């Protein structure tokens, strides 16, 4: 397997490990925001209007097309409020959604379902919105080898969640944080004297981590090309400069002028209009901060039903269980 793909796979595994810790903690924090600093549905004064033994069915419905993400977060909300609440899932993370589609059915106390409604929807709407936007970008690159990457431009506290949503939308993850890859930028280069010094220092410090160098000109690109950097980021390059960078890299590889073939990443001035033309230059990655920075939540809602919706064929149900029975099932 190419080293670049190993790095992506390792990053995905690391992300999933971090999520096991992050999901319960982020859900707890969100519930406390809504419930007076406690994870206690009794703090919801409006829901106290209902008797605690009054149970009801509810459905989560999408009001627009999109890509679903957030199953584990919704489950965790109701695990923490009342693990006896049951959920019947009709979709899984990464599924294509159509307007008015039922995503899941819940059954439990009226008061508790209402207490968790907004927190659960906030997570699922946000993550599904990110997955949907990512998928829009990915589909624009149909037939090309270029991959879409996210960035560290994420909402505070939701880094791992948003990066998981990127995967559900068909994108790939850039580094998760400052600890899992080197990214040598302008100020690093200035402080260390040169691109070569920076890369050499990184290799000595930790030879197992990927090294990426950001360049702002073709001259800097040529300097980075002569090092052992794994990835070279072309920051705010014009389309012509991208084409030239690819040609220079490929020529150097063909002539054995460099010992390895670094991957090229484009960053800056990336929009849906420019995306495909950038990819057609032959670059390997396009990183897009907009994916996790400017989020448009998917329109979802929860509604109560008089009884279980019999229109849903039993064979379509992915699972019906107490959410506490399989806390870390299919995400």
What are the residue ranges of the model-derived segments?
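Positively charged, low-complexity, intrinsically disordered RNA-binding extensions
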Residues: 237
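Active-site loop ensemble at the mouth of alpha/beta enzyme cores that anchors a bound cofactor
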Residues: 301-306, 310
